[in-house]
Amino acid sequence: DNVWLRFVALVHDIAKPRTKAFKEGLGWTFHGHEELGARMMKSLFRRLRLPLDPLPYVEKLVRLHLRPMALVNEIVTDSAVRRLVFDAGNDVDDLMKLCRADITSKNPGLVKKYIRNYDLVLQKIVEVEGRDRLRNWQPPVKGEEIMAICGLQQGKMVGVLKKAIEEAILDGRIPN
């Protein structure tokens, strides 16, 4: 029922032709098509005269559409899942629907493997999100508080400290 999720399903691989390259031993690759595709959305929206309100949502899902399945190429760590949920925010459910719909192959064994991987990532998201409550996450410390606690003036260092706190939470080094 989400027309923009359906739109993303149609356009998420739009940059594959521009990024197609043959790598010896690997075959055809499309490295970076997700980032280039996200950057192409603004001009596509303008050419098609689409409303710009859903553009950030569409760009985000195009940019992130490979991330959930890429998690299973390594051990699915809590910090990787935290970063995914943090980056996707409220759109993580739509992102996972897109990933599930993108599992296509004529090879039944490959489809089974991808679905198993998808289920693993989905389960891990539920576990981590249940523990950490990351959706709509807000940093626990505001810039003004950092300035007051550290005796700093407004500036770059405040942002550096705020980002370091955010990274420590996402890595699980300090609790949320």
Where are these regions (language model features)?
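Conserved, hydrophobic alpha-helical core segments of structured domains
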Residues: 1-99, 109
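Charged substrate- and nucleic-acid-binding regions of tRNA-handling and nucleotidyl-transfer enzymes
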Residues: 42-47, 105-176
